């Protein structure tokens, strides 16, 4: 009997939070690499457009409504994905939003909402797909973490607490799934240009970036793009059996030191999005 069952030629993947940002980029990247993909999110109109784009490029894609704060929605999404694509080989758990704010100015309800989306929602997805993966003796469950789970930043306490809980959950999964053929991994993005959290005005974002700089957490003005994380997640999923990418952190590279001075510090345009 082989030590490891090899990856099959067909590896259906489900991507939670696929309507925009890292999730959408990951769906596109995995489909480009030959993974059949099932996309889940609340904004089904955006999912439909993404499915059309993937199919137009020769990929295989389906989409279903998904709200990770609703247990029945998660179960329905996973069941419909399996019906459409077959047994799931890869889960990418990336659904989420972010509400920046100082802890003492953040309501307990908002704090709890962040836990529901980023921690409880991820748990719902994992427990929905893992029985089938364990029975199949293979699979990858890949969670989108955050560098704020590793090094806290001001104004991101609720989000960071939820992601720190996710780190602990994934560590437990990795230990408890050892020997089953299922690999649990977490990919931590650094600052990334996506819709999440950046719909704020300059008046809202300004104090946050200023506090980041005070604590030495905004040394330069380059942000990752969603595609950078998509490639990292695809790398984890495609890692050959017999090895396991447990944790990956991706940070934006600093501009060259001889770049103009205005490219060395975070700049804040009127709409609030860092340049």
Where are these regions (language model features)?
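Active-site loop-to-helix junction immediately N-terminal to the catalytic Tyr of the SDR YXXXK motif
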Residues: 106, 152-160, 172
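Active-site helix of classical SDR
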Residues: 126, 162
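Substrate-binding pocket helix/loop in short-chain dehydrogenase/reductase
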Residues: 102-103, 107-115
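Conserved glycine-rich cofactor-binding loop
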Residues: 19-20
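Residue(s) in the substrate-gating loop at a strand-loop-helix junction
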Residues: 146
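C-terminal helical subdomain
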Residues: 186, 205-259, 263
């Amino acid at each position: 009997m082989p030590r490891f069952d090899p990856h099959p030629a067909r590896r259906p993947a489900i991507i939670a939070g696929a309507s925009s940002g890292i999730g959408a980029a990951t769906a596109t990247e995995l489909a480009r690499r030959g993974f059949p993909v099932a996309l889940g999110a609340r904004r089904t109109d955006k999912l439909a457009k993404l499915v059309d784009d993937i199919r137009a490029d020769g990929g295989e894609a389906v989409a279903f409504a998904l709200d990770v704060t609703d247990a029945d929605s998660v179960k329905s999404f996973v069941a419909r994905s399996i019906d459409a694509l077959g047994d799931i080989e890869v889960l990418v758990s990336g659904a989420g939003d972010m509400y920046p704010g100082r802890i003492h100015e953040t309501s307990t309800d908002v704090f709890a909402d962040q836990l529901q989306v980023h921690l409880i929602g991820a748990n719902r997805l994992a427990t929905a797909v893992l029985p089938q993966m364990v029975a199949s003796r293979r699979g990858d469950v890949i969670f989108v973490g955050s560098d704020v789970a590793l090094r806290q930043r001001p104004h991101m306490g609720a989000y960071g607490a939820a992601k720190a809980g996710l780190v602990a959950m994934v560590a437990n999964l990795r230990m408890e799934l050892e020997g089953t053929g299922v690999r649990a991994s977490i990919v931590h993005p650094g600052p990334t240009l996506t819709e999440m959290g950046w719909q704020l005005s300059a008046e809202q974002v300004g104090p946050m970036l200023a506090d980041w700089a005070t604590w030495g957490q905004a040394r330069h003005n380059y942000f990752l793009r969603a595609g950078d994380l998509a490639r990292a997640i695809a790398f984890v999923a495609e890692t050959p059996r017999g090895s396991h990418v447990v944790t990956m952190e991706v940070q934006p590279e600093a501009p060259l030191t001889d770049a103009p001075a205005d490219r060395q510090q975070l700049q804040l345009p009127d709409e609030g999005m860092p340049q």
